[in-house]
Amino acid sequence: MAETAAGLCRFKANYAVERKIEPFYKGGKAQLDQTGHYLFCVCGTKVNILDVASGALLRSLEQEDQEDITSFDLSPDDEVLVTASRALLLAQWAWREGTVTRLWKAIHTAPVASMAFDATSTLLATGGCDGAVRVWDIVQHYGTHHFRGSPGVVHLVAFHPDPTRLLLFSSAVDTSIRVWSLQDRSCLAVLTAHYSAVTSLSFSEGGHTMLSSGRDKICIVWDLQSYQTTRTVPVFESVEASVLLPEQPAPALGVKSSGLHFLTAGDQGILRVWEAASGQCVYTQPQMPGLRQELTHCTLARAADLLLTVTADHNLLLYEAHSLQLQKQFAGYSEEVLDVRFLGPSDSHIVVASNSPCLKVFELQTLACQILHGHTDIVLALDVFRKGWLFASCAKDQSIRIWKMNKAGQVACVAQGSGHTHSVGTICCSRLKESFLVTGSQDCTVKLWPLPEALLAKSTAADSGPVLLQAQTTRRCHDKDINSLAVSPNDKLLATGSQDRTAKLWALPQCQLLGVFTGHRRGLWNVQFSPTDQVLATASADGTIKLWALQDFSCLKTFEGHDASVLKVAFVSRGSQLLSSGSDGLLKLWTIKSNECVRTLDAHEDKVWGLHCSQLDDHAITGGSDSRIILWKDVTEAEQAEEQAKREEQVIKQQELDNLLHEKRYLRALGLAISLDRPHTVLTVIQAIRRDPEACEKLEATVLRLRRDQKEALLRFCVTWNTNSRHCHEAQAVLGVLLRHEAPEELLAYDGVRGSLEALLPYTERHFQRLSRTLQAATFLDFLWHNMKLSPCPAAAPPAL
């Protein structure tokens, strides 16, 4: 039966990349435009621009020097973006078009650490690691001011919101805030009240008050008339950013009066709202479950009423400013992707485990992201139940969790369990129905966890919290770490793969040992049951994949081809093929019957830890240490259909070409023969044209009416013809037409013309020398002919007398 099913299925021949989820933010500054439609963030050498509504990457801006971006800022009118690189160059961008309008040297002696525009969008201030502050007029294109006096890195600069006051504020590593007068070109005041680095400066709407925050766990309110402190508010956390809120009531945030209120973000990982007058905290954001994530950045887009925060693991969160309701989540950088799975009954989502305690769920169509909190240490593995609504995760925190996605795509934790004494490195769900799951740990044990009926009927919106799971069976299975588990399609068998170089087969639910698979030279990374045959596949660090018979535990086949460890293996094409991923970043497609590698796919740059195939077997998803998540599509049928269409088109064109040659319509025949890539037919057409008494004129007219790509192909054909003395005359005739009628600049613009000319020269010289010798010989024969004279016949002797 399995053989019949495998015979009816079509073998896959190729996969193509359909979509990539790549890092777009690796730390540093992130900024919203005033409308809240676009998000700007730094990623290495680029500034990426995202559409906030869809999450799509619209454009990447990269300077010509291809050095890391150290700072950037968007003007208040949203028209100009300026970036600074490690090469000490400033670039002014028309960011909507993606073009650089001006590039100039920063004049700083060290990289630019901070920059800010004034309210008029005409002045730009840059703070350097050399302790200097410079001001630039980006309209007139010149430097206006150069302020010195700050010790060390100037990591913070800000203009006063009132452009008529011409004041610039800066802060360096000495924890003080300097006030610079652009009018007097001097330092007006040095504000010293912080005892650690100042992290942010924000101004009231009238510009009479400034709020500063620091890592000394205080926020200070300053009077900008007297440059004195009016209030020092202890906030009991290291503050990375603070924002002055609009002076209007916001009941959802505990703001009941129109006095001065501000919001802080820091190492506690939550947003808090403070009343400046009393120094009291009036609102505290609810703490997310799981490990606390430090907030590293916070900024307010007043016109859009949006608040942007950034977490330490590079997640960007957008809130509604007046209520702090979460609107959008973006995963800027997933670091090392450890596992990835399709999610949902129609595989509409994927769930990703990266080098983080948080899980990320992406909707594939829109790439909308949902970040799941719960684990307190790095999540190591995932698995999904058959229907696609429930999935399980395990982590280094020695716990497991079960998550449920509702029909709206929202995911919540519905169950959790603990009992292992070391990190839980692998997890596997039951296959027939949602009845149990199995976990394997570094404590060398396997646990079987039955799912209670209450869990399956439980709504994710319930307030009673996650159901607690209890292990039914615990068994010590190996002597070293258990790296992989697999449950058979009938839920009766369990396979385990370990670092001890063996795989074992167990009977469920009591975990009774049935047999051991031995033969690999190094540890096993993955085990998988065939969906149709009684076969087990194992992937090992020795670079091989082995197929084993479940009846007698013998090795049936060994697949060799990976140059490094094989990390994952999956059955595709109804069990007739294998798809594997390795630590060299390669994916390989194998046909089991022939034992051959059909295709090698190269799109990752590092280890591919995650590999999962969709329920319809037409897509695959991979995730690797390069932080890339790639969606692959089976393009076998599409390529075969395309190849069939090409063959049919070739037959039609060939018939048309034969008809044209029969009718002696050489111009169309020449163009068609070139498009069919038939050098011999093209040669035949040119020979037929040259047999005509008016060959030169007809050949010129025919060649000159060809398209440029056809002329390029004809020139390549000439290179081949020119190597043969029998066909060199046609090649030279075509070359002569091109040289006489095409300008040198046009010829040099041809694709591959330099290589063609280099190949033509030696044979052309050889043909020229041969013809010269022939001409010389012919001339010599002619000379001999004209100089040959016959001796006169002797006269008859007179008769004798």
Swiss-Prot record:
The keyword Phosphoprotein applies. There is a cross-link at K407 (Glycyl lysine isopeptide (Lys-Gly) (interchain with G-Cter in SUMO2)). The modification Phosphoserine is found at S257. Coiled coil: none annotated. The modification N-acetylalanine is found at A2. PROSITE patterns: WD_REPEATS_1, WD_REPEATS_2, WD_REPEATS_REGION. GO terms for cellular component: nucleolus; nucleoplasm; small-subunit processome. Pfam families: Utp13, WD40. GO terms for biological process: ribosomal small subunit biogenesis; rRNA processing. WD repeats lie at residues 64-105, 107-146, 149-190, 193-232, 245-284, 290-329, 332-372, 374-413, 419-459, 477-516, 519-560, 562-602, 604-642. Keywords: Acetylation, Isopeptide bond, Nucleus, Phosphoprotein, Repeat, Ubl conjugation, WD repeat. The keyword Repeat applies. It is found in: Nucleus, Nucleolus. It comes from the Eukaryota. Part of the small subunit (SSU) processome, first precursor of the small eukaryotic ribosomal subunit. During the assembly of the SSU processome in the nucleolus, many ribosome biogenesis factors, an RNA chaperone and ribosomal proteins associate with the nascent pre-rRNA and work in concert to generate RNA folding, modifications, rearrangements and cleavage as well as targeted degradation of pre-ribosomal RNA by the RNA exosome. Part of the small subunit (SSU) processome, composed of more than 70 proteins and the RNA chaperone small nucleolar RNA (snoRNA) U3. This is Transducin beta-like protein 3. It comes from Mus musculus (Mouse). The lineage of its organism: Eukaryota, Metazoa, Chordata, Craniata, Vertebrata.
